[in-house]
Structures are given as C-alpha cells and as structure tokens.
A protein has these predicted regions:
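Rieske [2Fe-2S] iron-sulfur-binding domain
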Residues: 3-122, 127, 224
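C-terminal catalytic domain of Rieske-type non-heme iron oxygenases
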Residues: 109-232
C-alpha cells in the first residue's frame, strides 16, 4: 500500500498512518525504511527523532537504529557493553517505485505486486503528481468512485455525464490474477464540452486499492490517470 511520495521522505523521519498503525518512514542511505513509530526502549515515537550517519536516532534517550531496525548505539551505556538483541524496531517491507513509497505490513510475501503504473516511468508521458486528498470514507468506496458510472450524470452533469442520459455504459469485465480489466465508451452527447467526441476509457483495477485509467485522444495522444488509496 502507498504511504508517501518519494520526495516527502527527506532528512528527517516522516510520520504517517497506515491501517490505523503509526509508522515512521525514513531515508537511510540509499534505502527507504518503514518502522512502527515506537522506540523499543520507552515507547517514544521514533518520528520525533532525527537521522544521523544513515541511522534514525530516538529523541528521548538517543538510541540509534540502522536501516534493518537494529539498535547500534545506546549513549547511556559504556561502548564495551553489548546491546541486547531484542533492541530492534518493528520494521515493515518497503519498496520505492513510481515516485511512491509502498509498504507491506505482513512478514509474509505480499499477496500482490505493486500496481502497474508504467506511464509514470515512460519518457513519452508528461507526468504530473496531484496533491494527496483526504476522503472521509472507506478505501474501497474511494477507489470504487472512479468507475461508478452511475453517479456521473447526477454529480458531474455537464462534465462527465448528462442528467438527461443517466443510464451508464455497459461494460464487460475480465479478470487476470488480482486485476479487473474493462472499458467504457462515453458518447459525445453525454458531454457539454465544445469539442466533445466519443471516446473509450480503459480501466485496470488492481487489488486492493489502485486503478489505472487511460484513453486515446483523436490526435493519437494517450492520456492516463493512476490512482491509489492509502487507508489510514
């Protein structure tokens, strides 16, 4: 699941919340790591600390943790004393792709790969990132909104739909592994745009909460949208 844009993770820990779990996302050297936002020592949020020598340092007692979550330094004990093996942060699987930091909170292999947002890496596309938006609804309802064609005529009259033509287009679904594929054709009469033309929107929905939508314009150019939801 997504937790942050890559450029949000800088020279200090980034506090985020995923599935009701507070996390601290840190850039440590050439790696991005995600930890439970809790120092193993006295329960201080590790996101209150700082990053030094590619390690995250707790703000309370100065314990240092490396990118694997293992404590490497406790300032209050002599250096010759061993650090307990259990002195580790809870760490989660983390990957960086498409300018987004993705986290899997299970210790097992992720059930599904990161969604295919290949246009974000295609030099033929001009890529724009939109600001994150907070929706007061479930993650499933948020992603469903993008292909819930029944609401277009009512909510988006004159833009994406027409209240005089409320019947949504028929679609045929195909399923491939953890993805749903379908297309929907929007007629020119369902838009009030000056140069409205009939066009087909293609959709690939990737479980659990991602969708890739694209359409080919009359001039041959492809417009693509990539959406993903971070359930907090």
């Amino acid at each position: 699941l997504p937790v942050a844009f890559s450029d949000e993770v800088g020279d200090k820990p980034l506090p985020v919340r995923l599935l009701d779990e507070p996390l601290a996302v840190c850039r440590l050297g050439n790696r991005v790591a995600a930890f439970r936002d809790l120092c193993i020592h006295r329960g201080t949020p590790i996101s209150l600390g700082w990053i030094k020598n590619n390690e995250v340092v707790c703000a309370y007692h100065g314990w240092s943790y490396n990118a694997d979550g293992r404590c490497t330094r406790i300032p209050s004990i002599p250096p010759e004393h061993p650090i307990p093996k259990k002195a580790c942060l809870t760490q989660y699987q983390t990957k960086e792709r498409y300018g987004i930091v993705w986290v899997c909170m299970s210790e097992k292999e992720p059930r599904a790969p990161i969604p295919d947002f290949s246009p974000l890496e295609d030099p033929n596309f001009h890529v724009l990132f939109r600001d994150k938006r907070h929706w007061n609804c479930s993650a499933a309802r948020a992603i469903e909104n993008f292909f819930d064609f029944g609401h277009f005529a009512c909510v988006h009259d004159g833009i994406l739909g027409d209240r005089n033509q409320p019947i949504p287009p028929e679609v045929t679904l195909t399923r491939e592994d953890n993805e749903l594929h379908f297309s929907a054709t929007r007629s020119a009469s369902q838009s009030h745009a000056v140069h409205a033309v009939e066009h087909k929107n293609n959709y690939r929905v990737t479980r659990p909460f991602s969708i890739h939508q694209w359409k080919v314009e009359p001039d041959g150019k492809t417009e693509a949208f990539c959406y993903t939801v971070m359930p907090i």
